[in-house]
Amino acid sequence: MISNFSRLQNIYNILFILFISLPGGLIYLLTGSTLSFWLRESGFDKITIGLFSLVNFIHIFKFLWGPLLEKISFIPSNSRGYKYCLIFSLLSCICCVYILTGFNPTTNFISFSLCLIILAFFSSIYDMLLQSSQMLLINNKNWGISEAACTSGFRIGILISGSGALYLSTIISWQEVYRTMAILCVPSLLLIIFYPLKFKEKIAVNDFDRFWHAFYDFIKKPKWLIIVGFMLLYRLQDNFLAVMPNMFYLDIGYTKKDLALGYKAFGMCATIAGGFIGGFLCRKYEYTYIFKRVLVYHALSSITFLLLYSYSQTITTLYIAVFLQEFTKGLTMSPFFSYQLRCCSSKYCITQIALITSIAYISTVLFGSISGYAATYLGWGYFFAIASFCFIPAYILIRYLPRV
């Protein structure tokens, strides 16, 4: 009876994680890919659009406020403080998105940029809480499934703020599009308020020295430097491409409606499918076995950019290219995020997850910010050729990764 109740509670918690992941995906694109379309229509060039990736630099430093967030979240240890933090961070994100719509990116450049940075700050807090929710609510053996659910919820959010926002922008202004996205986050906020959160185990409340304890606990792990290097390099290909595929598809003649349906909507479905398959693979195979294969598959998918650039640019070839790119991206993501959880200790979950994801975000910000320069000065052909080889550094590190 207890076992059945525990299993049912796990299912409810996994569904809860799926639904609260949705605003994370919604907000993610509002400072990234969707923003690039708004900036493009406002007259910004590829270099400037690429540099806007720097607004997400705040994610690099989230490990600094991780201990404070952990302290607040676990007072009291019955999950009430954790729920308050979820509510506050998501509500702040919604308000920031709404305020952002009051600025014009060309005439209010500074205010617009500052609002984006503040949005990225609260988004980073929400992301930390979201990722740690799996460790706090879900049994270890179900982390692969919960990560697939988290990724799927996140991707559905991206689908809405990607495909949905792009399609809406052909009907209404970008300011109205962003207001719509803010409103769509409200149901998840209400779910967080009314859902009866319960941790799978009692969390001890520690002092502010817990950052050093969390850091020391992490560096005691075998081959921790290899883990750090792997986190930094694993998504190098996607980080190098950044938002440039948006510009590429527009440059070779596709319309926003083509991209809303073919690239964003269909591509997101392919990513979700790949994410679920990747999550189930985590239950069957060892992580290094999965990483070796999915990295190569995803690298090969970059060749489709070159084929589109050199040959046919039909709707059919767009769908084929997008499926191969996004499905393999989904395959790479679930095992990676699940592995991140395995590298953390439950008692330091927020701080250590913040530390690991901060390391991963260095690559996102650094290579995303130079992608515009690379695409402009190398040309699309060389740009995508280089992207297809970006998997090599992470692939070399796989053989040295510790088993977790």
From Swiss-Prot:
Localization, per the record, is: Cell inner membrane
Note the topology in the membrane: Multi-pass membrane protein
* Gene3D superfamilies found in the cross-reference section: MFS general substrate transporter like domains (1.20.1250.20)
Q: Where are the transmembrane segments?
A: 11-31, 49-69, 84-104, 109-129, 154-174, 177-197, 224-244, 261-281, 294-311, 315-337, 353-373, 378-398
Annotated Gene Ontology MF terms? Answer: transmembrane transporter activity
* Pfam families noted in UniProt: MFS_1
- The protein depicted here goes by the name Putative transporter AmpG 2
The organism named in the record is Rickettsia bellii (strain RML369-C)
